[in-house]
């Protein structure tokens, strides 16, 4: 099984269909705490890529996963909102444990990968050097579950400013929770939720890990824009900028399993 040792900074630097039943899509979408591992695999489009050909390989992949009986909670596709260098989209897999992840990958590479490579030839490709796994901690669940297979996703790659640290982050999160409660009391519940992501791979001297990764998710673009408008009026942005420096990377997401 491939060892995950790639750096978060590499991930940051290069960043700028068909679905199954509603129950499994919900697991892929709403980030249940049972997802102990979230894995991101970079993909590039091939010469024969189209929405139709991609939908066919998604169906093929789901059939292969079902046939092998892997312990997997769901899967998503993330498409960057701006053109980036290094990949065209990211295939995300949600696992109940690292043991389940490793067992599935080991079996897949030995027994299934050849068939999969034939199925995706000309449509898309991936490099196993660009696989990144994280342990998620859900900090706030959505008040209104997303009933669609689409969502908006934003990573915040952050480093603490000098003389600041995790205690400052915790204090900010407490204020942020109060802000979300007040906003929902005024405007009604919404689909926003967020997750702290701990990398399950090592950084290097040339490419160290960020201090923390904050992942925000919304039901749609309108909800995201409304959330940002409220946030801008709250004064929290200035507080966040005081203790850390972050880079945002945004995607549109679609649950495929």
What does each of the following model-derived ranges do?
Residues 14-18:
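C-terminal motif of bacterial Sec signal peptides marking the signal peptidase cleavage site
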